[in-house]
Amino acid sequence: MKYSFPAFENGFIRAAAASPALRVADCVYNAEQIIGVMREYAEKNVQLLCLPEFALTGYTCSDLFLQDTLLRGAEDGLAAILKASQGLNIVVLVGLPVRYTGKLYNCAAVVCNGELLGLVPKLHLPNYGEFYEKRHFISGMAEPECIELAGQETLIGTNLLFACRQMPAFVLAAEICEDLWAPIPPSCAHALAGATVVANLSASDETVGKSAYRRALVCGQSARLLCAYLYADAGHGESTTDMTFAGHNLIAENGSLLADTAPFAGEAAVTELDLGRMVQERQRNTTFMPETTGYTTVEFDLPPISLALTRPVSCTPFVPQDAATRAERCELILRIQAEGLAKRMEHTHAKCGVIGISGGLDSCLALLVAVRACKVLGRDAKDIVALTMPCFGTTKRTRSNAEILCEALGVTFGEINITETVKSHFADIGQPADKYDVTFENCQARVRTLELMDYANKNGGFVIGTGDLSELALGWATYNGDHMSMYGVNAGVPKTLVRHIVQYVADTCGSDTLRGVLLDILDTPVSPELLPTAEDGTIAQQTEKLVGPYELHDFYLYYVLRFGFSPAKIYHLARTAFDGKYEPEVLLAWLKNFYRRFFAQQFKRSCLPDGPKVGSVTLSPRGDWRMPSDACNTLWMAELEKLEV
């Protein structure tokens, strides 16, 4: 059974765009079909249902729209829907013709629990090609006016918003079909006025290539407006005299297509909308400026419910699931890193780039980037000096892989054994050589940095940092040790993505030797190798056993930084994403650990070396993340303590 959690409290609602079967001009039949669909989806915990344009009459009635009988039938059908909606916890948008002040309007009726919340008329009427809407209808008014329809007094106007009292993030607006195709769709103003969800009631006939264009419009508008966008398309039952309708239903959120039905499939698009995310996106975007002038807000009630998400929640949000997209992403990141490093080496007139090579993942990626930077500059790979600096915890495996990797890439390889230097340093500060504490570990890291810096200084070189984004978030770096460099090429790359980039290079390099060593590096446990090896010479100190699985920390990092979600929401998302892989107690324990370390280790991030931004999440104190080094985590930890596993 899927994990269920309080959806409203965490900004989620379930929404659907459906195309009920209809009969042209048979309002009684159509109302019955709509009521059936409304009840069906209410039982499935759908809280927002969008139906097509003229769902009560059919879009293809043509001159029948001028008949009193059809208009009365549509009003009676709406009255039946209103009555049937009583006691249902769902908001429904239904398309119908409305006569007002002697003119006809193409409207979306917004229905909730027996109440007609409002009528939103179509603004842009197509009168070209196969469309002749101006023959029957006029464009809707912006400022809402009072109207009586289906036995209720309500408002009619395009500038209407519908707000849920129980969830401030749920603010609904509507537009109709051609409105989306217009140069400036009404939804632009709706979103600036506060709408987080736009529902489009449509009757878009199907022609060759149109579904792809329709999909692009919906996704593009949701991205531009930082909103969720529902698109319900007319389908089976419309007249085929001159057109065919495919029922192509879509739901997009901030540019991402969440649900997309195949044309003519007769299916509904159903998913959950993360409205909390929309609010977060807007408050971060300083060019998204509110403008509420001329708008009227109608409030409605929906009881909070719990949901098990049907929308996918990736365990690896930094890593694309599609193989082709992932490969494209890896190549782009490598280019960003290489171009950034090349510019810095060129600007500093560095004679060489110096890297501490451990045989681990991060230094491996940094070396791959450095070689690419040399190609950008037209320089020999020999201008990159890779130094291995073995000490107490270095294994034969990592030492061997470091050398093989350097030979395969054609860089200059060197070794500086720091064991005696570290022992001498221990003697200087009175550190027992058999006391394996944090000083024991940090001394080695700082000596390595000292060697790298002085080697670079002596040879006119430039120290290239290897630490990744995940390590920076957790503070898994020695202050003024591996924390310091002259340019950190991996600073914007999370650990889960580092693995895939190295795998990508292994798959595309064309060298059996290079591929072999890269695969073995990928298979090596992540470790700083600062504690003595095990008796069998293998790695004794494994990072993920100490700070937690990187796939969890990268998951937490993504939602903390990218969207500013609360600890509770992140925990619920983790329960959904890692269901069956990690026990709830484990997820919560590592989430607490993440927040403890993230706050405590900010002082290291406050003085980071320069490094290129590669994605939407980064920790540069000069760029995306500015946080005081002495901030308290009390509120976050208190929220975590209230969670029940």
Regions found by a protein language model. Name each.
Residues 1-354, 372-381, 413:
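Enzyme catalytic cores with a strong preference for nitrogen-chemistry domains
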Residues 13, 22, 30, 168-170, ...:
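ATP/NTP-dependent adenylation/nucleotidyl-transfer catalytic domains that generate, transfer
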